Structures are given as C-alpha cells and as structure tokens.
Amino acid sequence: MKLGIVGLPNVGVVPVPDERLEVLSEMNHSAKTVPAVIEFVDIAGLVKGASKGEGLGNQFLSNIREVDAIVHVVRCFEDSNIVHVDGSIDPLRDIETINLELIFSDIEILERRIAKSVKAARADKKLAGEVDMLNRLKGFLEEGHLAKNFELENEDEEAWFSEYNLLTSKPVIYAANVAEEDLADDGASNEQVSKVREFAKGEDSEVFVICAQIEQEIAELDEDEKKMFLEDMDLEESGLEKLIKASYRLLGLISYLTSGEQETKAWTITRGTKAPQAAGKIHTDFERGFIRAEVVSYENLVENGGYNGAKEKGLVRSEGKEYVVQDGDVVLFRFNV
C-alpha cells in the first residue's frame, strides 16, 4: 500500500503495528518477525502553482498518481515562530489550495486524453461515449469539484474512469496538526480542528489529530523509550499509528497471518479477498496451484496454546477456493504446481 502525504515529510516506509505478531512469533519460536508495511510518499513539493510548474511542478504531480490515497496534514495551531506561507492559519483555505492544484493537474490529464480519444473515435464509434464522458468530467472539474464526486452513468464509464488515475478521485484522510496541549482532548476545544471535521464530514472523509512536533520526537526513540514517552504524555498511541489505522479503514484493508519456525508474518489484503488470491500475496505459485487453506482464528490459536491444541479442539478448518479470508486468520496454504 502506498499513500501520498502532504505536510509531514520524511515518514517513508513504516511497519504496521500488530501485537498479534509478537505473540505468534514467541509461541512458534520464529527466527524472524515481519510486519506489514505502508509506504508514505512525501509530497511536500505540492504548493500553490504546482500545476503551472512552480515548486516541483507537473513531473512531481505525475509521480504521485500511483498512490492509493492522499493524507493531507493541515495546520491547526498558532505559533508566531513558525510563519505560515499565506500569513495566517486557515486549514480550509489550505485544503482548497491543495485541491485546486490537484484539479488543475487532472484537467490537464483529461485534455490530453480527450485529444487522443477524439482521434480514436473516428475509427471506433464506441469511443464516442468516452469522449462525451471526458467532456462532462472536464466541465465538472472546471467548476471546482473533485473527480471522486463525479456521477458515472454505466459500466463503460466506470472502466474508462478507472484508467485515468485522477488525483482527485483518490480517497483523502485529513490529519489536523495541533499544538501539544490540544492532544489531551483530541482537538475538541480547537476551533480550527472543528472546521476541518465539519468539512471532512461533508465529503465523507476521516479526520484524526496529530502533533507533528511530537511525532518528530517519537521518531528518534526506540520502542521502549517510545512507550514511556507516550505514557508520560498520557497518549494511547502515536499519531503515526492513528494514521496507519485510519488508512486501513479508508482502503478496506485487513491482515492475515502466517507463522512457523522460519518466520511470523502479516500480509495485507483487501477485505473480501478469497483464499487463492490471498495466497498469491505470498507467491504467484500459491495462487496458481491452490488446493486448500488450513485456517484458524488468532484468538482460537492463542487460547488453545498453539496450532496443535486448536486442531485437537476441531478449531482448524480446511477451506476451499471460495473462502473469504478474515482479519486475524492464521493460515497455512496447501498448493501444488
């Protein structure tokens, strides 16, 4: 999974926290433990005028089209020592600035696609429908709307739309960046955070509160120091952990687990994935030669002291190709190629 992040640089590739891994690893004396990871693409170069070549410009915008979602960190704190580029604190203005740059970039993509499709439609009349949709979509964006709110009229339009990979079609998470003292009540008393929450509600996006300054401090600590730091701050989890959980919810992701002497590992899949496709995350041979999956829930495995104990109780199931893998399933795939 890859997320573009605006306003919180140097995050990079981060492990997905999952306490279940350590328990399974200890139970099976695994040589190594491998968490799932999320890659955050730093899009700090996204500034007013980027679509016209300012900042890192258009090449930069094209580079972030492959992200699955966008995380927009918006400033919700006052500090005279940290000057805002626009001279005042207004998170809704900042959101609009970024959205406009993404819209302008998407319009440019559509203009190129229209020119290409008009030519192709001369030879293939079926493509006239795409040209019509492209013009409707372009007009929609020119009115200041986001592509994700555009109404698609049929399956053909859905297929065409998915090919364009428009930035404004991607889901968004808003991270309200607050001062340290606003963390205690999760930003409830911060007027700017309230504005962001109200705005996000209108577009069915999620908002969480973060203090970037504290995140920078946490990033320099080892795991034990981090736990102590969070306890001292009376926080249950770091902002980065909040972000990871929000990302999983937004994209409908879950993790299944594999565990043995060699390694214990978490694998990220989309909710609703069937067993053969989940197996394919490990290796394409697993999907191609899938026979069955031996499955036990994490809870049943731990409660019965391990795989053998769970099997004796009849809690290890043999599942076929139609089985939908669940979050926390501990799976052993049987395959033959």
Feature annotation, model-predicted:
Residues 1-7, 118-324, 336:
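C-terminal-of-GTPase-core extension/linker across diverse P-loop GTPases
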Residues 1-83, 92, 99, 111-112, ...:
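Conserved G1/Walker A P-loop phosphate-binding module
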Residues 18-21, 31-40, 54-68, 92-95, ...:
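Amphipathic alpha-helical transducer elements in NTP-driven molecular machines
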Residues 20-21, 45-47, 75-81, 88-90, ...:
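Conserved nucleotide-binding/hydrolysis micro-motifs of P-loop NTPases
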Residues 42, 333-334:
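Conserved metal-binding segment of the jelly-roll/cupin
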Residues 57-163, 174, 208:
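Long, charged N-terminal accessory/stalk domains
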Residues 75, 335-336:
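Short, surface-exposed secondary-structure boundary micro-motifs
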Residues 326-331:
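Structural motif
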